[in-house]
Amino acid sequence: MCGIWYSSGFSDISNKQLEIVSHRGPDYSNMIKMSNSIAIGHNRLSIIDLNPRSNQPMFSKDKNHIIVFNGEIYNYLELKDELEKLGHVFYSTGDTEVLLHSYLQWGKNCLHKFNGMFVFLIFEKSTNKIFVARDRFGIK
């Protein structure tokens, strides 16, 4: 199980937040500071696509959207195929990138397409907006 977090409004953001949830993901940890008071962090437990290209936080191709994700999208291969037919290009083989592309394609309506257990946060740098969602049953 991975660990994700988002911090806003605190001027003292440090790697301490990553350390607190390090037991949730021993394979990789990273924090992205957007400003002195906004940060996104992720502790990874590698399950799908063990390659470092799937480390998080993960950026969209244009670097405007950043995602942190915990869980599993069971139908991600079907969604990936649908998105590729719509012109999306993927650089990893995991479900995190599929989730991000789904949001970029369908916005909040992407939630109706996911079959799985998940919690994720997407930060849009150009607007400083966040989108946070979890699975229907609150497993994650």
What are these regions (language model features)?
Residues 1-140:
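N-terminus-centric sequence/structural signature that marks the extreme N-terminus
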